[in-house]
């Protein structure tokens, strides 16, 4: 598998309004009853077949009984979740060997404060569970963008792994120190690989400025081997719609982080609009409403919750 489809591109997906979810509520109740009735089949299937076999069995045909059992198996969700938090920090901006930005009030107010994923390392940590692991990048994205691709297309405008330009600001980095910064990207990718395992879900944790879109919650994924099942994506959309959020699918951002691994796992991005949890014109938290909703979502993602 190759590293591909990193988050960070504006998406061309679609948005759901909470008003359209009444039918989904009825369907969810029916689905829960169906899952309970078929629990025995799920247990039998999970004991013998490896992660990813379900999608292969369905897409390539196979015996009818296998297709039915494998589809049931998908309802078991995940045994492990890895939280990827690459943009939650401001560290390094005043480090003489890492920053190289001409920092002034405008840069902090209009660039750093706007594009830092404030408090995502708090919002996604409401559920204390040994099955959830966190990989938080400890430096600002304006030091190293740990989620860019190697040879990312954004490099052409000075916003690859190591930003050289951002809006009207420029950054001149000595070549030897730039290599040190690139090593931080490798370090973050290695930590993600070590945290992941067969069949896990990587949950890509982000926020975005409220002037970018009126969408409250953006759910993103890749159209490749890392895409969760349609059932899981639908569950994610309905979970937040039923709580009154306007949900975008691969909009306004698309894709999700996929570090190179030699085993199968899924990746799902969750972007939250800053207006849903920050006080207007501030980086102060409103309350724990969104955090509680994310916690409930994580509980649904975990097997047996």
What is each PLM-predicted segment?
Residues 65-202, 207-305:
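N-terminal catalytic or cofactor-binding beta/alpha core of small enzyme domains
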Residues 4-6, 37, 69, 80:
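Absolute N-terminal positional cue centered near the fourth residue
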């Amino acid at each position: 598998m190759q590293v591909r489809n990193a988050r960070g591109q504006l998406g061309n997906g679609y948005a759901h309004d909470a008003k359209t979810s009444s039918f989904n509520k009825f369907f969810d109740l029916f689905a829960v009853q169906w899952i309970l009735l078929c629990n025995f089949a799920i247990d039998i299937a999970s004991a013998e077949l490896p992660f990813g076999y379900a999608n292969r069995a369905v897409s390539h045909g196979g015996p009818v009984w296998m297709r039915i059992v494998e589809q049931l198996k998908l309802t078991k969700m995940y045994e492990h979740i890895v939280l990827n938090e690459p943009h939650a920090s401001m560290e390094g901006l005043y480090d003489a060997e890492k920053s190289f930005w001409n920092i002034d009030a405008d840069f902090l107010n209009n660039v750093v404060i706007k594009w830092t994923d404030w408090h995502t390392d708090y919002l996604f940590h409401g559920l204390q569970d040994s099955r959830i692991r966190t990989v938080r990048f400890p430096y600002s994205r304006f030091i190293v963008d740990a989620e860019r691709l190697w040879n990312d297309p954004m490099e052409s405008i000075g916003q690859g792994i190591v930003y050289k330009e951002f809006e009207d600001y420029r950054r001149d980095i000595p070549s030897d120190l730039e290599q040190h910064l690139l090593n931080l990207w490798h370090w973050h990718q290695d930590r993600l690989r070590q945290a992941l395992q067969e069949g896990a879900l990587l949950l890509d944790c982000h926020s975005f400025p409220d002037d970018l879109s009126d969408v409250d919650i953006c759910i993103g994924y890749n159209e490749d081997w890392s895409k969760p099942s349609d059932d899981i994506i639908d569950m994610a959309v309905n979970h937040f719609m039923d709580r009154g959020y306007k949900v975008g699918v691969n909009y306004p951002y698309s894709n999700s982080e996929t570090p190179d691994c030699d085993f199968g796992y899924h990746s799902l991005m969750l972007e939250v609009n800053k207006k849903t949890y920050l006080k207007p014109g501030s980086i102060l938290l409103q309350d724990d409403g969104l955090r509680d909703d994310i916690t409930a979502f994580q509980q649904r993602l975990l097997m047996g919750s």
